[in-house]
Regions:
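A domain-start/cap signature at the N-terminus of enzymes
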Residues: 29-68
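Acidic catalytic loop of the alpha/beta-hydrolase fold
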Residues: 196-201, 229
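Short substrate-entry loop that stabilizes the transition state in hydrolases
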Residues: 62-116
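A conserved short beta-strand
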Residues: 163-174
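Short beta-strand/loop motif that positions the catalytic acidic residue
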Residues: 190-193
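Gly/Ser-rich "nucleophile elbow"/oxyanion-hole loop immediately N-terminal to the catalytic nucleophile
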Residues: 60-67, 113-149, 159-165
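Alpha/beta-hydrolase-fold serine-hydrolase catalytic core, especially in secreted/extracellular enzymes
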Residues: 36, 46-53, 214-357
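Catalytic centers of hydrolytic enzymes
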Residues: 331-561
């Protein structure tokens, strides 16, 4: 049996936390049938013509005669497709859990340390399609889980593709994408964290979970007392049992969908093709009020594609379409066609045109700007950081933006055509909401000082090292010079801020719980406002408004040699 002790429930704010004591994997797994097949496979990537690996486990009862649930399990930082199968000293517990719960189990590489965004997300979707071709997969019972970075990735994919997945179980995730929280209405979530894990992880999860619960999403947050970062991976059996009990509704009569960029604009029978004001969320509320009537409520949407689902609508009849309080008309939309709605000067125009859906596994399909040359994170004053901080200020109207790349895992913005996916990849690892706070010029100068490297000390080793990673604060709205030969506390030798003036400052939300931007005496003590703007969403808005990405080095950050 499985033994569980000390179970109790308490409420913190709006979030119900379910506490579980130590859990032992007992004879329930030991009595499983003979082992199934643990296979190492690859697919050929259309992006770069390489073979990308994944591990898949086929339970002993799998014979291809019926469709099976599929659980996609994503590894953490520094891991690979084998980590969850062979690591964590758990004697293959994840495969035993898949066997006991009657599910196919696959773990992709995800292209390594990508946060499962950009090319990492593409890898997950390609593996899903590949496995569905090779094996009998129940597409209404496809699930996401993962640990740490993989838990964050599970949340990212489920919230961006609520029409694809039946449920998600992020384990020790780092953040939760609160601006997409309403997309959890159709995707049940089981978040599991360790009570002794870093505050960074708990804050990152809570901010999204609270918003999900506010809107009535089917969300559970469990905190394991006495457990740290690896605690949530100790009982895959219980996690998998929870997952396989859920089933996707492939043909909803109504839904609400939040969209941050057009890369993730499609769900069910609508596609946001163009956002009216990039950098702000677009929303779609769609309802089939009858078999021949659809009502749409759209916010910040400039162009929308509507492809009626034959399971929901009578596609042999003309469909009555309304947007807000406006009747768009009645339209016969044959197979292979879509209704394109465009907002022109505040009025909706509709036209039936050939459907042109983007491939789910396509890559770099959404050009947004151009760059005359590659923009990277190299140097004392980093050109990419100049552009990022300008985007943060533009999104929030703050006086100053502060950003550093101490955990940077991103990629340069390429020369030539810049796609939205390039913006998603340039900003990794973090993608949390932006926060604003009020600080004096004197306080800001001290923060700049706090983040200067000490020549006599080495910086903490990072799990991943990318060119340009480092602690020196990058800025917009100010300039400063530093001299590392000066004594600590006096190394910032010039700064153009008024020490007595109070400024509105924008930062990434993660710095409020993880001292990556060394806030000194303000860490976990300063009052701040959480904006509804995601980090990557701000970059998309800035790129779309300018159309050209070509930041200069302007002397914002200089070292005295």
């Amino acid at each position: 049996m499985e033994a569980a002790t000390g179970r109790r429930t308490r409420h913190v704010g709006r979030v119900a936390l379910v506490w579980f004591g130590a859990v032992l994997l007992g004879s329930r797994l030991a009595g499983a049938a003979a082992p199934g097949q643990d296979l190492r496979q690859t697919y050929r990537s259309a992006i770069d013509d390489t073979d990308q690996p994944y591990r898949i486990y086929l339970p002993s009862a799998y014979d291809g005669n019926r469709a099976w649930p599929l659980i996609i399990a994503m590894h953490g930082t520094g891991g690979n497709e084998a980590t969850l199968f062979d690591g964590y000293e758990n004697d293959g517990a994840i495969k035993k859990a898949a066997e006991a719960n009657g599910a196919l189990l696959v773990s992709p590489l995800g292209r390594g340390v990508t946060e499962f965004r950009g090319i990492g997300e593409n890898d997950i979707l390609c593996v899903l399609e590949e496995v569905a071709k090779r094996y009998r997969v129940d597409r209404d019972r496809v699930y996401l889980t993962g640990h740490s970075m993989g838990g964050t990735g599970a949340a990212y994919l489920a919230l961006h593709h609520p029409d694809l997945f039946a449920a998600a179980a992020p384990l020790a995730a780092a953040y939760s994408f609160p601006w997409l929280a309403r997309n959890a209405a159709t995707v049940p979530f089981l978040w599991i964290s360790g009570a002794k894990d870093s505050d960074f992880y708990m804050r990152g999860v809570l901010v999204g979970v609270e918003r999900m619960l506010k809107f009535g999403g089917p969300v559970t947050l469990e905190v394991l007392p006495g457990e740290g970062h690896r605690g949530p991976v100790q009982d895959f059996h219980r996690v998998f049992a929870w997952l396989v009990a859920r089933k996707r509704d492939p043909h909803p009569q109504s839904y609400f969908f939040e969209v941050d960029t057009p890369v993730h604009g499609s769900a069910w029978w609508t596609t946001v093709e163009k956002i009216a004001e990039p950098g702000r969320m677009a929303t779609v509320r769609a309802e089939a009020t009858s078999r021949t009537t659809v009502h749409l409520q759209l916010e910040n949407v400039a162009e929308l594609g509507f492809t009626p689902d034959p399971a929901v609508f009578d596609v042999e009849q003309a469909l009555a379409v309304s947007v807000g309080n406006t009747e768009a008309g009645r339209f016969k939309i044959p197979a292979g066609q879509a209704l394109r709605l465009s907002n022109v000067s505040g009025r909706w125009r509709a036209e039936v045109k050939p459907a042109q859906p983007k491939a789910l596994t396509g890559f770099r399909q959404f050009p947004v700007a151009t760059a005359p040359e590659e923009i990277d994170m190299v140097g004392t004053e980093k050109r990419l950081a100049n552009w990022i901080t300008d985007a943060m200020r533009a999104a929030t109207q703050a006086d100053i933006a502060l950003y550093n790349a101490v955990y940077y895992r991103g990629l340069p913005i390429p020369a030539g055509t810049v796609d939205i996916v390039d913006l998603i990849q340039c900003s990794r690892p973090f993608d949390e909401e932006l926060v604003t706070l009020r600080l004096s010029g004197r306080e800001i100068r001290q923060m700049l000082e706090n983040n200067l490297p000490d020549p006599g000390k080495s910086e903490p080793a990072l799990a991943v090292n990318r060119a340009g990673a480092g602690p020196i604060v990058q800025v917009s709205g100010l300039r400063y010079k530093f001299d590392l030969k000066q004594p600590a506390g006096r190394r910032v030798v010039e700064c153009n801020l008024d020490p007595d003036r109070t400024y509105t400052v924008v930062m990434e939300g993660q710095v409020m719980a993880r001292d990556t931007l060394r806030l000194g005496a303000h860490f976990k003590k300063v009052n701040y406002t959480t904006t509804p703007i995601g980090f990557t969403t701000a970059l998309y808005g800035h790129a779309a408004r300018s159309g050209v990405i070509n930041p200069a080095r302007e002397g914002r950050v200089e070292e005295v040699r």
